[in-house]
């Protein structure tokens, strides 16, 4: 309800956090406008809701577009809406299983999406662990989205696919290490090897 959103907004502003939420219909999008969020988010289930996509793109805010449960034709249409209006966006590779098994994550799709759409690509993970998110960064993901919870045993549709505090800390730590681990790709003899 409204009181929960006001609590989230107040807390995040106090901590300097840019929060935002997925609007699942135009009325929800109008509701979220009162919080002057910097970003918009299209949930995977809304990827084919053309009036909603057009309204979101019309706001001109950078939008994160999740692509779970979709075919290329759906992504093509969404991308064209945002490109025609010149609204900045990031495609979020996602598998809409809660939780996703590691073998369902298909992280190799990230560079494919990047090449096909010539845009920023991120990863919205719903797996139990942290490795797929780290591998997503190694494959070129520029944004990582994970659900978080205080307790994975709590009741809720996505609690088991969420990270607790320690899991979030590990994800951030390991994702930040990817660049130095990947290196430059140049074949050089390091000082330690000499």
What are these regions, as identified by a protein language model?
Residues 1-194:
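Catalytic cores and adjacent flexible loops of soluble metabolic enzymes
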């Amino acid at each position: 309800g409204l009181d929960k959103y006001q609590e989230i907004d107040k807390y995040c502003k106090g901590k300097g956090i840019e929060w935002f939420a997925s609007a699942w219909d135009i009325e929800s999008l109008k509701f979220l406008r009162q919080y002057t969020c910097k970003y918009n988010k299209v949930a995977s289930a809304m990827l084919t809701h053309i009036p909603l996509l057009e309204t979101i793109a019309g706001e001109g805010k950078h939008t994160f577009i999740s692509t779970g449960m979709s075919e290329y034709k759906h992504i093509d249409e969404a991308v064209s809406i945002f490109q025609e209006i010149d609204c900045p966006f990031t495609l979020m590779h996602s598998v809409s299983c809660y939780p996703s098994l590691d073998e369902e994550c298909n992280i190799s799709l990230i560079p494919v999406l990047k090449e096909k759409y010539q845009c920023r690509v991120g990863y919205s993970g719903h797996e139990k662990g942290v490795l797929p998110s780290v591998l997503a960064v190694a494959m070129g993901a520029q944004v990582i989205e994970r659900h978080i919870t205080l307790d994975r045993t709590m009741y809720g549709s996505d609690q088991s696919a969420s990270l607790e505090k320690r899991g979030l800390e590990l994800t951030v730590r390991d994702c930040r290490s990817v660049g130095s681990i990947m290196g430059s790709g140049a074949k050089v003899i390091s000082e330690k090897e000499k």
